[in-house]
Amino acid sequence: MNAPDSPPPAARPVGLFCGLAVVDVIQLVEAPPAPDDKIVALDQIIAAGGPATNAAVAFAALGGRAILAAPVGAGPLADFVRADLAACGVELIDCSECSESTARPDCPDRPDCLEPALTADAVDSAGAADAVEGLDGVNAVSAMSAVSSAAPMASGLSISSCTVTAATGQRSVVSTNARAGADPAPLERYASQVAAGRKSPPGIVLIDGHNPVLAAVGLDLAARVGVLSVMDAGSWKDDAANLPGCCDVVAASARFYPPGPSGLMAAPEDVAHWLLDAGAHGAVITRGADPALWWCAGARGAVAPPRVEAVDTLGAGDIFHGALARGLVGARRGDIVGPVLGAAVERACAVAAASTELFGTRAWRQRVRGRGN
C-alpha cells in the first residue's frame, strides 16, 4: 500500500506488437552438424519466438506493458506459447483463424480480447517461478514433450529449429514462418475498445512484416491515437514491400535489400534513402557487432554496440527492436530528431548486446529487468 503522501505509481507505457509467434527449439552445439551427421547438443531451450514476440518480451522486461497480436490458436504448442508469454509479462491478442477443430479462447465472441500476463506478484510466487524455470530450459523435458505430442496441424504454429554455435554465438534457423492463418477481428475489437475508452491506448506500435493483415490494423490504430509506428523490417519480404512507407521508424538488418533501378540495393546509405523516400521519418540499420546506423530529419549517426563475449546471438535483433520501441514509446512523429533517435538506438544496442551474453532468448531479462528509458 502507498504511503498517504506518496504519489500513485506511474502507469507502465503500453506497446502493441503485431506479427509472428512461433515455437523456438534451440540447441547449443559445438559446431553445426555436417550433412548426414548426428551430434549431441550441449544444452537446449524451448521458448516462444518470432520477431514481434521477442520484441514484446524485451519491452516487458524493460518495464513496459507489452501486448502481442499474433495467431496462436489451440493445442499443446499454443498452450506452451501462452504459458511462456504470461511468464514473461506479455498479454496476448490471439488472432488465429477460428475453426471447429481449433477454437481459440476468445472465439467466437469473447468480450475481452486480451489474454492476461502474470502479474508481478504472480511471477514472484513459487508456482510462477516453477513455470519460468521450465521455460528457461532447466526443466525443458516437459516442454519438449508437449512439442513431440502435438498433432502436426493442431494449432498451425510454426516450429523454428535453431542451432547456436557455442564458440561464436552464431545461430542458424529453419522455420516455415507465418504458417497459421491470421484473423484481424480480435485486434480490431481491441482497437474499438481503445476508441471507446475501455482499453488503454498503446504508446507505440511495432510490426514485424509477418501477417500484413495485422500490421494494417496496428498501423491504423497508431495513426488514430497519434503514436509512433515502428517496423522491424528484418530482411526483405515481397509481401511486406509497402509497409516501410507506412511506418514512422523502420529498423532493418544489413540483409534488407530493396529493389533498385540497377538491381537490389545493398549499401546502407542507399537502403536508408530508399526507406526515407518511401515515407519513413527515421531509418535504422543494424549490423550485428558493427555499429548500428541511423538517419532522420537531415541527421545521421552511428552507434557502436558494447563489446561483449557473445554466447548466443539468436533473437538479438528482435530484442533490439523491443528496446528501441521502449526508448521511443510516447514520442510523436515530430519528435523523431537526431538526439531522440540516436539515444534510443544507443540504449537498444546496449540491451541487445547484453542479451547475447547468455544462452537462450529469456535468461538475459534478469540483467535488465525494469530498466526503462
Where are these regions (language model features)?
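A glycine-rich helix N-cap at a beta->alpha junction
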Residues: 84, 88-98, 149-153
